[in-house]
């Protein structure tokens, strides 16, 4: 009996020791497939942002082109025909918005902050180019858009900005990107090729893309009168200067993967 009691006491003691030593359970493990805002690296965020920006672009093209096709029907139609009488299904018009804001834009401030701290200037440049591209896509589709308070700091109630604010902001992002691509990376930073699935880490291709987008966006201001693009005016001289530094052949193209 004494032996039996001793065995029980030993078992209880062992269990108490086991559980007291495991108060944090498996907190020591970090799941590389599910990074958090705190431990996600700037290079991993870039690949994620590129994927979602690419998807937002595809959905924008798909939704708009299919809608146009359904609008040509005389009666009835598929999923998108209801858009012709202004009664669209929610998913038909919000998917590009969701993929851009929820998948890409929300990650950009974190990438810029971490890359800046690490002096990974080329990552900052890529993030700025994508930010300009994504928000210009959104304002082309939807008009006025949450811009200045639309990302991580906005929460669930972002405010809307007008087209001029968005245009000038996107052009400023491209100017910043061009500056960043011309800076020398910090000695301990990850190569741009580690996280870049669009240009394979080619800074030259990123620069050409930035100049091309800048020329394209300034050209859209043709009805705003001649002047400086910095003031939201049509700036023909700047367009031509940017085109001289943009892609000159297919070998210079950015490929969205």
How would you name each of these model-derived features?
Residues 1-20:
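Sec-dependent bacterial lipoprotein signal peptides
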Residues 3, 30-32, 162:
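Short, solvent-exposed coil/turn linker segments
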Residues 6, 10, 26-28, 246, ...:
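Residue-level marker of intrinsically disordered, low-complexity segments enriched
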Residues 6, 58-68, 124-133, 192:
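Short, mixed-charge, low-aromatic patches
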Residues 9, 51-58, 113, 186, ...:
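Generic surface-pattern signal
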Residues 14, 56-60, 253:
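Short secondary-structure junctions and interdomain/linker hinges
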Residues 22-73, 87:
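Membrane-proximal, proline-rich intrinsically disordered regions
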Residues 39-43, 74-257:
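Structured, solvent-exposed acidic/aromatic patches
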């Amino acid at each position: 009996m004494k032996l039996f009691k001793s065995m029980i006491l030993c078992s209880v003691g062992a269990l108490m020791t086991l559980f007291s030593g495991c108060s944090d359970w498996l907190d020591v493990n970090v799941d590389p497939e599910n990074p958090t805002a705190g431990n996600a690296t700037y290079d991993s965020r870039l690949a994620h942002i590129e994927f979602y920006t690419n998807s937002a672009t595809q959905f924008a093209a798909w939704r708009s082109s299919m809608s146009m096709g359904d609008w040509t029907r005389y009666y009835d139609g598929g999923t998108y025909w209801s858009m012709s009488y202004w009664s669209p299904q929610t998913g038909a018009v919000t998917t590009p918005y969701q993929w851009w804001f929820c998948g890409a834009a929300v990650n950009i401030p974190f990438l810029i902050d971490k890359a800046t701290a690490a002096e990974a200037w080329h990552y900052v440049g890529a993030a700025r180019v994508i930010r300009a591209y994504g928000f210009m896509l959104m304002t082309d589709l939807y008009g006025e858009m949450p811009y200045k308070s639309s990302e991580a700091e906005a929460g669930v109630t972002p405010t809307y900005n007008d087209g001029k604010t968005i245009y000038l902001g996107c052009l400023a992002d491209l100017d910043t990107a061009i500056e960043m691509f011309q800076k020398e990376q910090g000695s301990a930073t990850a190569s741009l090729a580690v996280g870049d699935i669009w240009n394979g880490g080619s800074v030259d291709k990123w620069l050409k893309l930035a100049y091309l987008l800048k020329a394209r966006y300034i050209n859209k201001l043709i009805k705003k009168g001649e002047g400086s693009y910095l003031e939201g005016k049509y700036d023909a001289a700047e367009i031509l200067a940017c085109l001289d530094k943009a892609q000159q052949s297919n070998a210079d193209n950015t490929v969205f993967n």
